[in-house]
Structure formats: structure tokens, C-alpha cells
Amino acid sequence: MVREEVAGSTQTLQWKCVESRVDSKRLYYGRFILSPLRKGQADTVGIALRRALLGEIEGTCITRAKFWSVPHEYSTIAGIEESVQEILLNLKEIVLRSNLYGVRDASICVKGPRYITAQDIILPPSVEIVDTAQPIANLTEPIDFCIDLQIKRDRGYQTELRKNYQDGSYPIDAVSMPVRNVNYSIFSCGNGNEKHEILFLEIWTNGSLTPKEALYEASRNLIDLFLPFLHAEEEGTSFEENKNRFTPPLFTFQKRLTNLKKNKKGIPLNCIFIDQLELTSRTYNCLKRANIHTLLDLLSKTEEDLLRIDSFRMEDRKHIWDTLEKHLPIDLLKNKLSF
């Protein structure tokens, strides 16, 4: 972080992209400005956005590879220049772009002699390769080469325990971090009591999303983190009132969902996707990871099922019900339901 004094004045709060370029297929750069900010605010925003950009953005990568008739990852395969470990490292570097949730299967099946690149990966429709020229292996002899792959969308660095899998599959330490680097600098301008700060934010991504898309997603994630405090303020709750009180799961949530299902006669709930419910990105992502794509999928789950979803919180449950209550009777069902 760099702090400098510069001349100038900014009258209204605004943000904009002041520079954007594509250095390569796997390196995008963007530079953004936010101003005016009071003294100290630029640091607060800069630190929060940097952490969110580096740690909260989801990415898609290869998490497992299955070879046939390979005893261990340090083996060499006749007719292939690289060892199994080198092939795994090359697969780890493959950059993918997708909006998938859950685990998907992919594969490679080619005949040598030839170079194998990312272009040879057979992917599900929802996944695409950012750089098809990324190398995987070099077949030096006319052999058949097949690998089964597993693809997953996640966030951060996922380390898999090394085990001796009997079926020839090997875990890959996945790096689900589309943002490669973030830097911010603060410029102070003005005189005396009129001083304010300008925040410059630089973002480098791996090409699976643009810096602008990464900034948007990081901002949404930060907003979701603070929503519980906003709800607490709206409901007039205080820490003193709640610090010694335990709130058990409310059975009324499940009861209301049951009533809603009883009133769904003639309504094609399998045609109503959760994208239409205006859920927060956090709640939406939780449901998608649990393979809940439609309203029918959601209503088939019990409250206990929802609470078992990874990262799903009581606040998410309340938000889902509030959203159903707000939108379904009016916008989607077109008739008033009584609960």
C-alpha cells in the first residue's frame, strides 16, 4: 500500500475503471478509482476489498485425475515424456471458466504420437477452457492415452490428503483463486479540513473472469457479510437482549413450506428457478452447491436438510422464507396464499 499527496479535488462520490487491458489469455489487468473518501476510509475499503478479492471469489478447476494401470503418481508411462506427477501439475494449472455448482466429470482420450493440450479435454457444456494451448503431456509413441477428470467450483486453496487410491485416481491440490494479485494505493488531496482520500485499486485475474467481474463479486460477498447487522437494526434487536438467549430452529418455517406445497396445485414449480427469487448471492450459492435449482427442489427439502448445507446459516433460512413470502404469492403464483 502506498500513500501519496496529490493536488486536486473530487466533488461527488464515484467509482470508475481508469485502465483495463488483457496481457495474455491468463492475465487480465484492471485499475479502478473510488473517491472522495474521508481520512481513513480508503484504508478500510482497500483492506476489505483486497481480502475479499483474494479469498472469497470462487473459481473452477480440476480436483482429481484417474489414470488406468498406474501404480503411483511418481510412475512413468511408456510412450509419454512426462511422469504422472508432471501431468498432475500441468492439470492443476489449467484455467477453467464456468458457473457450475457441485462436481462435474471430464475426460481426455487421445492417440499418439502428439502433444496433448487443454483443448483435448472433453468438458461438460457448462465449462469452458480459458487457454486451450496450455500443455498437459507429450505422447512420443502411438499409444492410447485416457484420463478421467473431476471438476469442481470452490474458493481458496484446497489441499487433499495423499492416499494410495486403488482405482488409480489421484487428488490435485486445487487453487480456486481467479484473482492472482491485488494492490491498492491511497492519494490524499485538498487542504486543511477539506482533505479527502482517493483509493486506487489494481486487480490481476487469471482470465476466468475480468477484474470488473471480480470486483463486483467481492463487493457482493462483503455486503452479504454485513446483512445480519442490518437486519438486527431493522428488527430493533440489541446485543444485551440476545447475548444470553438461545433461539432454537423454528418449526414454523417447515410448517409454512408444507402449507405452500399443499397450495401448489396446478403450479409448475419445477419451472420456477431460484434465479427468479432475488436471493442474495450468498444464499443463492449455498442452494446451488446443494443442487437446488428450482422451487420444487427447494420445497422438497426439510429445514434440517437446509441447515446441513455447507455454510448455510439461520439467517439464510429466514431470508429464503421472507423471499418466498414476498414474491411467490404476488409475482409468481398470482394468487394470495394464507399461512
UniProtKB/Swiss-Prot annotation:
Alpha N-terminal domain (alpha-NTD), as annotated region: 1-233
Q: What class of enzyme is it?
A: transferase
Give yes or no: UniProt keyword Nucleotidyltransferase.
yes
The UniProt keywords, alphabetically, are: Chloroplast, DNA-directed RNA polymerase, Nucleotidyltransferase, Plastid, Transcription, Transferase
GO biological process terms held by the UniProt record: DNA-templated transcription
Q: Which GO terms describe its molecular function?
A: DNA binding; DNA-directed RNA polymerase activity; protein dimerization activity
Q: Where is this region: Alpha C-terminal domain (alpha-CTD)?
A: 264-339
Q: Which Gene3D superfamilies does UniProt cross-reference here?
A: 5' to 3' exonuclease, C-terminal subdomain, DNA-directed RNA polymerase, insert domain, RNA polymerase, RBP11-like subunit
EC nos = 2.7.7.6
Q: Which reaction does it catalyse?
A: RNA(n) + a ribonucleoside 5'-triphosphate = RNA(n+1) + diphosphate
**Subcellular location(s) of the protein:** Plastid, Chloroplast
Q: Which SMART domains match?
A: RPOLD (SM00662)
GO cellular component terms, A-Z: chloroplast; DNA-directed RNA polymerase complex; mitochondrion
Domain characteristics, as noted in the entry: The N-terminal domain is essential for RNAP assembly and basal transcription, whereas the C-terminal domain is involved in interaction with transcriptional regulators and with upstream promoter elements.
Stated family: Belongs to the RNA polymerase alpha chain family.
Function according to Swiss-Prot or TrEMBL:
DNA-dependent RNA polymerase catalyzes the transcription of DNA into RNA using the four ribonucleoside triphosphates as substrates.
Looking up NCBIfam families in the UniProt record yields:
rpoA
Question: What do we know about how this protein assembles, alone or with others?
Answer: In plastids the minimal PEP RNA polymerase catalytic core is composed of four subunits: alpha, beta, beta', and beta''. When a (nuclear-encoded) sigma factor is associated with the core the holoenzyme is formed, which can initiate transcription.
Protein name, please?
Answer: DNA-directed RNA polymerase subunit alpha
**Name of encoding gene:** rpoA
